[in-house]
Each structure stands twice: as structure tokens, then as C-alpha cells.
UniProtKB/Swiss-Prot annotation:
Sites of 4-carboxyglutamate modification: E21, E56, E60, E67, E71
Subcellular locations according to the entry: Secreted
Keyword line: Chondrogenesis, Developmental protein, Differentiation, Disulfide bond, Gamma-carboxyglutamic acid, Osteogenesis, Phosphoprotein, Secreted, Signal
Residue spans crossing the bilayer: none
GO biological process: cartilage development; cell differentiation; ossification; regulation of bone mineralization
Domain Gla: 51-97
Modification note: Requires vitamin K-dependent gamma-carboxylation for its function.
Function: Associates with the organic matrix of bone and cartilage. Thought to act as an inhibitor of bone formation.
Entry annotated with the keyword Phosphoprotein: yes
SUPFAM superfamilies the record matches: GLA-domain (SSF57630)
Record PTM Phosphoserine, positions in chain: S22, S25, S28
Protein name: Matrix Gla protein
Amino acid sequence: MKSLLLLSVLAALAVAALCYESHESLESYEINPFLNRRNANTFISPQQRWRAKAQERIRELNKPPYELNREACDDYKLCERYAMVYGYNAAYNRYFRQRPGAK
């Protein structure tokens, strides 16, 4: 009985030691993950924002044809399902290519 009491006291101390909450966790942003607009804009300078937007526009304009075909296919559910089985190239050809003689 004495050993059971000693074991339970040791277990309680172990639980208390392992479950101790330090003050470091209170300093993190996990408590409030959402920032207001003013604080959110301080992370990236306007110069970096402008450069990122310009690079994104350039990437959108210079996409290879297979990427454009894939995006068109992703927007159409039947084409996307067909692509999962036969590939995006075959799916795009089936649903979006002009057929000979068709207008």
C-alpha cells in the first residue's frame, strides 16, 4: 500500500512537471493568429509588394501552353475527371480542341 501511494505521488509530480505551461508560449502569436490590416502590411514593404505583383503578371503572361491547357481543364469538371485517367493533354484535346470541319 505504501509503494502504491509513493507511485501515485511520483506520477502526480511527473504529470505536474510535464504539463507546466511556461510563459514563452504566451509570447507567441498563437493566442491571436489574426492581425489587423495595419500590422499585416508592415511585413512587406511597398517596394517588395510592387515587385511581387509585377513578377506574378510576367509569370501569367509567359505560361507555357501545357499549363494554360491544364488550367482550362481544371475549370471544367468532366475534363478534370478525364484527365485523371488519361492525362491532361488527352483531356484537353477531347474537350477543348477544335474538331476538323467544326466552327
